[in-house]
Amino acid sequence: MKIVLLGAPGAGKGTLAKDLSIMFSVPHISTGDMFREAVAAGTELGVKVQNILSSGALVPDEIVNQVVEERLRKQDCEKGFIFDGYPRTIAQAIALDEILQKMSKKLDLAIYLEASEETVVKRLTSRRICPKCGKIYNLISMPPVSDQICDDCGEQLVIREDDKEEVVRKRYRLYLETTAPLVEYYSGRDILVSVNSERDHRKLVEDVSRLLKKVIS
């Protein structure tokens, strides 16, 4: 099962990908998480990425594609993968096709999560993350048991720089300019499915998992 999840920042790609990863036993590959790990490690790449993410801009394709190819060649991707946040552009989509072709593989499905700008802003500005274990919360839909404290490890939750409203709106505009055309790209290849991500998350997971079971059966 080889799929990509498309949609604006805050459409719910990461949460859905994690649920599907557990359900189907394939890795959830998030370039965003990889970059944040690099930032935390303080590597040269991490410093570059930190400056880019803090400004709300996108990481250059050359860096992204290199990280992706290295990840896909790991053994746990043999049976499939779920991409969250990649590809973001037509150029990245073409690069992914070329990477998979070298590995004698191809995408099974591209799932587009539809969400309005105001929904995205509301979700992301309410999002909090544990700096220690990486668990993600939402103060509205998935709050921690104790205010601003991680349920799992007791750390104080933080808001990421790229979840502040000004940056969120900038990211949404960038999404419209660069990522939205991917919907047409994958639709033209007849592997696109669009779903409404503004509904109850459990219902969304149920519907998407049912769809994927048909694809891999």
Curated annotation (Swiss-Prot):
Chaperone is among the record's keywords: no
InterPro entries recorded: Adenyl_kin_sub, Adenylat/UMP-CMP_kin, Adenylat_kinase_CS, Adenylate_kinase_lid-dom, P-loop_NTPase
PROSITE patterns: ADENYLATE_KINASE (PS00113)
Listed SUPFAM superfamilies: P-loop containing nucleoside triphosphate hydrolases (SSF52540)
UniProt entry keywords in alphabetical sequence: ATP-binding, Cytoplasm, Kinase, Metal-binding, Nucleotide biosynthesis, Nucleotide-binding, Transferase, Zinc
GO MF annotation: an example: ATP binding
Region feature LID, mapped onto this chain: 126-163
One Pfam family this sequence matches: ADK_lid
Compartment annotation: Cytoplasm
GO biological process terms held by the UniProt record: AMP salvage
Binding locations of AMP: 31, 36, 57-59, 85-88, 92, 160, 171
NMP: region residues: 30-59
The keyword Ubl conjugation is assigned to this record: no
Catalytically driven reaction(s): AMP + ATP = 2 ADP
Chief localization: cytoplasm
HAMAP family listed in its UniProt record: Adenylate_kinase_Adk (MF_00235)
PANTHER family referenced in this protein's UniProt entry, alphabetically: NUCLEOTIDE KINASE
Role of this protein: Catalyzes the reversible transfer of the terminal phosphate group between ATP and AMP. Plays an important role in cellular energy homeostasis and in adenine nucleotide metabolism.
UniProt note: domains: Consists of three domains, a large central CORE domain and two small peripheral domains, NMPbind and LID, which undergo movements during catalysis. The LID domain closes over the site of phosphoryl transfer upon ATP binding. Assembling and dissambling the active center during each catalytic cycle provides an effective means to prevent ATP hydrolysis. Some bacteria have evolved a zinc-coordinating structure that stabilizes the LID domain.
Family that this chain belongs to: Belongs to the adenylate kinase family.
Name of the protein described by the UniProt record: Adenylate kinase
Species this chain originates from: Pseudothermotoga lettingae (strain ATCC BAA-301 / DSM 14385 / NBRC 107922 / TMO) (Thermotoga lettingae)
